[in-house]
């Protein structure tokens, strides 16, 4: 049986699975074929359990299709292949990751002799600053479809820092949970290795520290400090834009950390290649590991966030009230939590029960602003401008894809962002019936799962209309 069997499986899995799934779960696996048993080695227990739960049938099916009755048995283990293998016998999953999800690293200098996470030394400097907020953990991060992959990737990094996903780059709009995940990773690493040097900071703090070091003729101390950490977590990396000296220093810090198997996690409000004012060599490096988007939370996740927040405050929030708020406030988690805090404060001050009518009163200015900002007319104008067509095209009977797809997108956005019924939405789109609107909504939902471009279009339009 050929040792190229796993490579054949990888090629098929890469074709069959969404790009993000393949990059996150399949690519890190290593394989060893021996005595009619194919052993798959996962970097940690989390990956092992996920692969066995989600992809066991896929892999077994491929083995059977390639080998028939002679298909090897599968065995899963945590760790790496035995080092006694010859290079020719090693079978690893070095299939190039799709560019829009993650890019494998170009050849770099050989890593230092530092072995990484089995021998983390005690902190050397008493002035070392972690800045990790202990309140932000994976346990109190509300997971939904919009952030599931980002949370899973962050969890893997916390369990195996300096491993497969280095750097990890999280991007998305304001208030979607990027900072929460940074702190959760920091807490996860320090729970596993209490002596680990984990530093969280905003990108502007890095710039300020560098300026002070230059002013005090202490740039070497600055370099030693940042290059000695075990994990560097930097928020809002887009603020490095047009700061040439800071980018130069971070470039060398980035290289030093990766060569030492030290973890880097970065966040931004946009995809790495879309960050203006940042050098191409840095943007390229941002994509060396894994890049994951965090989307605005869908309705069910917004409701879960409100219910969890209310529970943390010992407040009984009726389900219908949570749905009422979640249906009307859609842009980000911070806005949701702020609205709920306002409702709770009003209830405490007045002693009234939290009902839908009470929420309407407590949030009347906020709800009025939302309804004013997001109308079907506004959605139609925004979608037409985005796709470079005319609003009249959206209302017409034209069925060409260049018009039909934007029309479906606009209908789906109208259902998501307004409180209009399906018949009302249909009337606003040239007198179409409610079944046409329903079909459009289902079609866009399907395409968001299948097409990276449609998913990005939907997220961009939601962000524009909700801001």
From Swiss-Prot:
InterPro entries from the UniProt entry: AAA+_ATPase, Chromosome_initiator_DnaA, Chromosome_initiator_DnaA-like, Chromosome_initiator_DnaA_CS, DnaA_C, DnaA_dom, DnaA_N_dom, DnaA_N_sf
GO biological process: DNA replication; DNA replication initiation; negative regulation of DNA-templated DNA replication initiation; positive regulation of DNA-templated DNA replication initiation; regulation of DNA replication; regulation of DNA-templated DNA replication initiation
Region (Domain I, interacts with DnaA modulators): 1-90
Start-end of Low complexity biased regions: 98-111
Residue sites binding ATP per the record: 175, 177-179
Post-translational events: Acetylated at Lys-178 by PatZ. Deacetylated by CobB. Is also acetylated nonenzymatically by acetyl-phosphate. Acetylation levels increase in a growth phase-dependent manner and peak in stationnary phase.
Region of interest (Domain II, transiently binds replication helicase), residue spans: 91-130
Miscellaneous note of the record: At least 4 systems specifically target DnaA to prevent more than 1 round of replication initiation per cell cycle. 1: SeqA binds to and sequesters hemimethylated oriC, preventing DnaA binding. 2: ATP-DnaA binds to the chromosomal datA locus, hydrolyzing ATP-DnaA in the presence of IHF. 3: ATP-DnaA binds to its own promoter, repressing transcription. 4: RIDA (regulatory inactivation of DnaA) via Hda and the DNA-loaded beta clamp (dnaN) hydrolyzes ATP-DnaA to ADP-DnaA.
Function according to Swiss-Prot or TrEMBL: Plays an essential in the initiation and regulation of chromosomal replication. Binds in an ATP-dependent fashion to the origin of replication (oriC) to initiate formation of the DNA replication initiation complex once per cell cycle. Binds the DnaA box (consensus sequence 5'-TTATC[CA]A[CA]A-3') and separates the double-stranded (ds)DNA. Forms a right-handed helical filament on oriC DNA; dsDNA binds to the exterior of the filament while single-stranded (ss)DNA is stabiized in the filament's interior. Also required for replication of some plasmid DNA; binds 4 DnaA boxes in the minimal plasmid RK2 replication origin (oriV).
Protein known as: Chromosomal replication initiator protein DnaA
Upper lineage: Bacteria, Pseudomonadati, Pseudomonadota, Gammaproteobacteria, Enterobacterales
């Amino acid at each position: 049986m050929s040792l190229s069997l796993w490579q054949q499986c990888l090629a098929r899995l890469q074709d069959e699975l969404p790009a993000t799934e393949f990059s996150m779960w399949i690519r890190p696996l290593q394989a060893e074929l021996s005595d009619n048993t194919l052993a798959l080695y996962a970097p940690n227990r989390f990956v092992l359990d996920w692969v066995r739960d989600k992809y066991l049938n896929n892999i077994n099916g491929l083995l059977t299709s390639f080998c028939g009755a002679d298909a090897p048995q599968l065995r899963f283990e945590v760790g790496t292949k035995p080092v006694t293998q010859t290079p020719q016998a090693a079978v690893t999953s070095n299939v190039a990751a799709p560019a829009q999800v993650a890019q494998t690293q170009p050849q770099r200098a050989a890593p230092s002799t530092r072995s990484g996470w089995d021998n983390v030394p005690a902190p050397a400097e008493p002035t070392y600053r972690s800045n990790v907020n202990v309140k932000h953990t994976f346990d109190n991060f509300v997971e939904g479809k919009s952030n599931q992959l980002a949370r899973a990737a962050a969890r893997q990094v916390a369990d195996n820092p300096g491993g497969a996903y280095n750097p990890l780059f999280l991007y998305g709009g304001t208030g979607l949970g990027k900072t929460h995940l940074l702190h959760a990773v920091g807490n996860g690493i320090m729970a596993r290795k209490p002596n680990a040097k984990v530093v969280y900071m905003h990108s502007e703090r890095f710039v300020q520290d560098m300026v002070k070091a230059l002013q005090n003729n202490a740039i070497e101390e600055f370099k030693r400090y940042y290059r000695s950490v075990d994990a560097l977590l930097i928020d809002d990396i887009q603020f490095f834009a047009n700061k040439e000296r800071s980018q130069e220093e971070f470039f060398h810090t980035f290289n030093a950390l990766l060569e030492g198997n030290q973890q880097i996690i970065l966040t931004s409000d946009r995809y790495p290649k879309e960050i203006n004012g940042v050098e191409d060599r840095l943007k390229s490096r941002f994509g060396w590991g894994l890049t994951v988007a965090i989307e605005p939370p869908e309705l069910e996740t917004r409701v879960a966030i409100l219910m969890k927040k209310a529970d943390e405050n010992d407040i009984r929030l009726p389900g219908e009230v949570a749905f009422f708020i979640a249906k009307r406030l859609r842009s980000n988690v911070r806005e949701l939590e702020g609205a709920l805090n306002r409702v709770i404060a009003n209830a405490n001050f007045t002693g009234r029960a939290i009902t839908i009518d009470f929420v309407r009163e407590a949030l009347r200015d906020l709800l009025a602003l939302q309804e004013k900002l997001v109308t079907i007319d506004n959605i139609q104008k925004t979608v037409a401008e985005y796709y470079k067509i005319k609003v009249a095209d959206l209302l017409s009977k034209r069925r060409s894809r260049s018009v039909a797809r934007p029309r479906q997108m606009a209908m789906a956005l109208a259902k998501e962002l307004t409180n209009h019924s399906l018949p009302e939405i249909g009337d606003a789109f040239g007198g179409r019936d409610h079944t046409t609107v329903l079909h459009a909504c289902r079609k866009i939902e399907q395409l968001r799962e299948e097409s990276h471009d449609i998913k990005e279009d939907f997220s961009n339009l939601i962000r524009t209309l909700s801001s």
